[in-house]
Amino acid sequence: MYYTEKKSFFEYIRNINIELEEFNLKLTVIGFWGGYPKQNAASSGYLLEHEGFRLLIDCGSGVLSKLQNIIQPEELDAVLLSHYHPDHIADIGVLQHARLIQGFLGKKNSTLPLYGHDMDPYEFSKLTYKEITKGVAYNPSEILTVGPFQVSFLKTDHPVPCYAMRIEADGKAIVYTADSSFKDEFIEFSRNADVLLCECNFYGHQNGKSAGHMNSIDAGKFAQKADVKQLILTHLPHYGSISELITEAASEFTGIIILAEEFQSISL
């Protein structure tokens, strides 16, 4: 790109910055509520972008609607699913139909790969739809390559089979816990991550272990022991004052803590 008299200097700089951003590892929160979305919001969904590749992590209720504020459904390159609870996959069906309709309108879309585990054969089978999407089973014991991303997995403690993910690209690492109560294996799995996207379904005085979830104290201790650079609390409860979750987590973790918010973006 070259600066010309027809292009203002500021527009030139802006376009350079946009081009450079494509080479950063960028995380954008699409939805973050646990269980179900609040009014005009979404449950679990996170967009990762790097080198022009767009990967959606989980696709819960409301995610497709919110995603269209950033990109269109046909612009996705892949989807990666942690497990098959509705608050993480509810919008898979409408994503499939969106791409189907775009095809009817003359837009040529390649088959979209939907990566998921095959420990639930019925749910996994629904990931394949006509020539629109193709379910691809990941092997949790192996590193998965999706576009520019290298993904490793850790089975979580949750009522159904569920996998946490460590997603790496160009020396940067984001760990997404998905749904789980705390387990010691998380520490090494998350060691020195740039971002820990940690579920926080309960307040510090509540015990979420039997439900397969963490509370704010669990998240803080986890982040401190793993020596992560930044903790993002997500999968948030629908009651109480959620700002208290930061205060409670900060009693254990001395680093940066933020609550997940709609369209919140972090570039690494």
Give the location of each predicted region.
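Active-site neighborhood of phospho(di)ester-bond hydrolases with catalytic His/Asp-centered motifs
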Residues: 56-60, 77-83, 87, 175-180, ...
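Catalytic core of the metallo-beta-lactamase
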Residues: 136-192
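Metal-dependent catalytic neighborhoods of phosphoester/phosphodiester hydrolases
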Residues: 91-99, 126, 241-249
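Conserved beta-strand hairpin/beta-sheet module of binuclear metal-dependent hydrolase folds
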Residues: 20-71, 162-178, 195
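Short internal beta-strands
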Residues: 110-119, 232-233
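Active-site metal-binding motif and surrounding structural segment of the metallo-beta-lactamase
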Residues: 62-111
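Cap/insert and terminal regions of metallo-dependent hydrolase folds
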Residues: 182-265
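Polybasic, lysine-rich low-complexity intrinsically disordered segments
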Residues: 6-8, 15
